[in-house]
Amino acid sequence: MADFEMVLKHWGPVEADYATHGNLVLTRLFTEHPETQKLFPKFAGIAKADMAGNAAISAHGATVLKKLGELLKAKGSHAAIIKPMANSHATKHKIPIKNFELISEVIGKVMHEKAGLDAAGQKALKNVMTTIIADIEANYKELGFTG
């Protein structure tokens, strides 16, 4: 619970501009881990130089961060939020669990740079994301998805 609170203390700047922060997260994810861009068919042909100004990347990044905000505010009571998300990511999008770990690292970097998330906050975010990812993975296993 304390980890969720610590991350939420720094969530305000992210929440104030989901589109900008979401674009930063996805652009960095695609730049640092180019293989992840292939998991998003609608972004597959976008050149690195064009990502920062791409409205679709901003919109999807905003969706990702809004969902993370819901999960943070649930403070661990997130089964009802995770189940449908895990279902769509396993059955429709086929997103391997490793990619949640990659985007978590990127979110930590962006929050450090743009929202002042310090070392203790980064550790708290890592703890929170480890819990969330474990719960997503448990749902994946129930669905028989080994991605």
From Swiss-Prot:
Ranges of residues in domain Globin: 2-137
Documented EC number(s): 1.7.-.-, 1.11.1.-
Stored InterPro entries: Globin, Globin-like_sf, Myoglobin
SUPFAM superfamilies reported in the protein's UniProt record: Globin-like
Record field: catalytic activity: Fe(III)-heme b-[protein] + nitric oxide + H2O = Fe(II)-heme b-[protein] + nitrite + 2 H(+); H2O2 + AH2 = A + 2 H2O
Keyword Cytoplasm in annotation: yes
GO CC term, one of those recorded: extracellular exosome
Signal peptide feature range: none
Binding residue positions for nitrite: 60
Primary location recorded for the protein, binned into one broad class: cytoplasm
Compartments it resides in: Cytoplasm, Sarcoplasm
Sites where the protein binds O2: 60
Amino-acid positions noted as binding heme b in the UniProt annotation, renumbered to this chain: 89
Keywords attached to this entry: Cytoplasm, Heme, Iron, Metal-binding, Muscle protein, Oxidoreductase, Oxygen transport, Transport
Family of the protein in this entry: Belongs to the globin family.
Function: Monomeric heme protein which primary function is to store oxygen and facilitate its diffusion within muscle tissues. Reversibly binds oxygen through a pentacoordinated heme iron and enables its timely and efficient release as needed during periods of heightened demand. Depending on the oxidative conditions of tissues and cells, and in addition to its ability to bind oxygen, it also has a nitrite reductase activity whereby it regulates the production of bioactive nitric oxide.
Complexes and interactors: Monomeric.
Protein's name in the database: Myoglobin
Organism this protein belongs to: Makaira nigricans (Atlantic blue marlin)
Phylogenetic lineage: Eukaryota, Metazoa, Chordata, Craniata, Vertebrata
